[in-house]
Amino acid sequence: MIEILENKNNETDKNLKSITLKNSNEKIAEIKIANTFFSRLMGLMFKKNGKVQVLFEIPEKINKKERSSIHSFFMRFEIVLVFIDKSNAVYEISELKPWNYYVPKKPAKYIVEFDRREFNDCLKIGDEIEIK
């Protein structure tokens, strides 16, 4: 079981809520939540590195019409995309080079965007995510 814990103070970005992704023993990643149109649009674009990862909350109305596609335009590094379904399970993991586009196999409830250099196989297909 992977837990997502809300952080009380957000030092990484004053405009985005920060959470910590952890398993039972250790912190996996510091994650920003992208839950507005603009924050979902920006993701990790224009960043020099991906020391802080991004969790996209996909609105249900988008999920019904589209397939939670992701692009890496204006990215300076490769990313790993982790797709989480409505039962909070990781169902797909994909790598994406800069200036590419990816459409997952099915709609996602959440997508986590990692800098590939920071990912370290910290999540696997079938992992269940618990948000606290």
Put a short name on every predicted segment.
Residues 2-132:
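Compact, glycine-rich, soluble single-domain proteins
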